[in-house]
Amino acid sequence: MMNRRHFIQISATSILALSANRFAMAKGKSDVDLRIVATTDVHSFLTDFDYYKDAPTDKFGFTRAASLIRQARAEVKNSVLVDNGDLIQGNPIADYQAAQGYKEGKSNPAIDCLNAMNYEVGTLGNHEFNYGLNYLADAIKQAKFPIVNSNVVKAGTEEPYFTPYVIQEKSVVDNQGKTHKLKIGYIGFVPPQIMVWDKANLQGKVETRDIVKTAQKYVPEMKKKGADIVVALAHTGPSDEPYQEGAENSAFYLADVPHIDAVIFGHSHRLFPNKEFAKSPNADIVNGTVKGIPESMAGYWANNISVVDLGLTEHKGKWIVTSGKAVLRPIYDIETKKALAKNDPEITALLKPVHEATRKYVSQPIGKATDNMYSYLALLQDDPTIQIVNQAQKAYVEKVAPSIAAMAGLPILSAGAPFKAGGRKNDPTGYTEVNKGKLTFRNAADLYLYPNTLVVVKATGEQLKEWLECSAGMFKQIDPTSDKPQSLIDWEGFRTYNFDVIDGVNYEYDLTKPARYDGECKLINPESHRVVNLTYQGKPVDPKAEFLIATNNYRAYGNKFPGTGDKHIVYASPDESRQILADYIKATSEKEGSVNPNADKNWRFVPITGNDKLDVRFETSPSEQAAKFIAEKAQYPMKQVGTDEIGFAVYQIDLSK
């Protein structure tokens, strides 16, 4: 039987004490075996087709995952199928659907797929809120299964905005062939930070609550109402850091909440169980458990499915979980580079109309480009994929600024970040690749991945410098005296989409200094300053001078980077950043014949000299196209020195120049 302490109630602070406890699964004989099959972070990657490259792929797609789902369920007598959110956004199929809306009986293709596969229940991810609450409500109505979320409440109340949980009665067959009724409770969670990320869509309508506290509130209620077991559908990532109220990544903390029997989690686009977590004090990657509780996270874009097997024994009229194990089943083997799953015929046929419509939608011509736009070097030097976005944002603001008093006469800058630059160092193919010549809406979607809107903030020169210091956390500190290999990019501690390049000013990064801020833009080295030679129009930036910075709603409302947050916002555009980019390409092409995306090289690294044996390395795409681009466009001498275990090409960069 599970060695687990059952509390009626635990306080928020006691979670720290409980974190030291390890719940161990006893290897007992089970009466009923129950399999939970799960998907997470599908992001409307429904087909095995890359719409950005207009080519098929065997590395992702729900059509392939569906065949693994059917296989996993066919192997056992008792199974349930659940989805963990971030379903309806993230792919050109989703963009096409959002552009069409639900008029004339049109339905959401992602929901259609889950309906066809007979999902039992789903939950919401943070990206479900990107298109607004009305669009989300229309999508939820189409689901033939309940969608649960417990920690989003109606503004100004504690009343759940969505159905917080459900308890479903399921007929199960025991190991002797006898049928029983098992009551399975499902509860859903989303990161509280949606109130920042989608503030424009949510403010005044909903509020969020802490994930762990919400679990402590509802799970005992679910047990009182008869739930034999409780499954948490937690759209939140893992963390071994001490629990803090309001944490974005709370999946591991849920293992401390009494009566939760399994946790399906996601959000961070990682894999669990996986060797990445081998050193986690909370995780058992052999059995797929956290503090004894089965937990699983199935990557992203339907590239994996979670399979969680629970053993249950009936004791005095109650079902008790006596064993649990979680594994992942990938659709593609990264090491052998072989597909492990075929397309499911039913789902493939279901998606054929929307697949063809999406290809047509993203193939709309919008203009021409004079040069290739690849993001292979976006973390190393000024980059064309960011340059063109910043050009578009700046041009847009230049049009609206004169009519808005708070903006008139101020210098206009623009901030952009690489959305596709190797993922979280988990995707060697995850780079923006837009060829010169004819451009289509597909290319605009590749250049600007998210359905953000443009927002303008007003910041001082001092805040501008600190903003760039936050971005400088992308890089590890370089020891100028060492002759050992040193990694340049801090993949583990920093997300590439937080590496803002600000156009309109010039600046340099001194990488021999420690980072002033960490990956969450928290001050860690107050005496360190990496940003040097910051100038505007050739003159040093005055710390007290005011600037307008065009950015996106995610960054502007986040209040994470200096110069952002409510008090700095002077203009919030109703237009999507991607559409602004497409319109800019179209208007410029019509006027000048094409757009010129060549980077203006407004930022660079301070040369590190005096050590001929300095060995600094970075990772990027292993493709021949990338190698050719690097040979032609690199601002620094670079040479490939190997390939890492994930498949990234490893380059050595000469930072003395």
From Swiss-Prot:
Q: Which UniProt keywords apply?
A: Hydrolase, Metal-binding, Multifunctional enzyme, Nucleotide-binding, Periplasm, Signal
Gene Ontology molecular function, alphabetical: 2',3'-cyclic-nucleotide 2'-phosphodiesterase activity; 3'-nucleotidase activity; metal ion binding; nucleotide binding
Q: Which GO terms describe its cellular component?
A: outer membrane-bounded periplasmic space
Residues that bind a divalent metal cation 2, according to the entry?
A: 86, 126, 235, 267
Q: What is its EC number?
A: 3.1.3.6, 3.1.4.16
Question: What InterPro entries does the entry give?
Answer: 5'-Nucleotdase_C, 5'-Nucleotdase_C_sf, 5'-Nucleotdase_CS, 5_nucleotidase/apyrase, Calcineurin-like_PHP_ApaH, CpdB_N, Cyc_nuc_PDE_nucleotidase, Metallo-depent_PP-like
Stretches that traverse the bilayer: none
Cofactor (UniProt) = a divalent metal cation
Q: Where in the cell is it found?
A: Periplasm
Which CDD domains does this chain map to?
MPP_CpdB_N (cd07410)
Q: Which PROSITE patterns match?
A: 5_NUCLEOTIDASE_1, 5_NUCLEOTIDASE_2
Which one Pfam family would you cite for this protein? Metallophos
Q: Which residues form the signal peptide?
A: 1-26
Q: Which reaction does it catalyse?
A: a nucleoside 2',3'-cyclic phosphate + H2O = a nucleoside 3'-phosphate + H(+); a ribonucleoside 3'-phosphate + H2O = a ribonucleoside + phosphate
Record-annotated residues binding substrate? 450, 554-559
Q: Which NCBIfam families match?
A: CycNucDiestase, PRK09420.1
Protein purpose? This bifunctional enzyme catalyzes two consecutive reactions during ribonucleic acid degradation. Converts a 2',3'-cyclic nucleotide to a 3'-nucleotide and then the 3'-nucleotide to the corresponding nucleoside and phosphate.
Q: What is this protein called?
A: 2',3'-cyclic-nucleotide 2'-phosphodiesterase/3'-nucleotidase
Q: Which organism is it from?
A: Haemophilus influenzae (strain ATCC 51907 / DSM 11121 / KW20 / Rd)
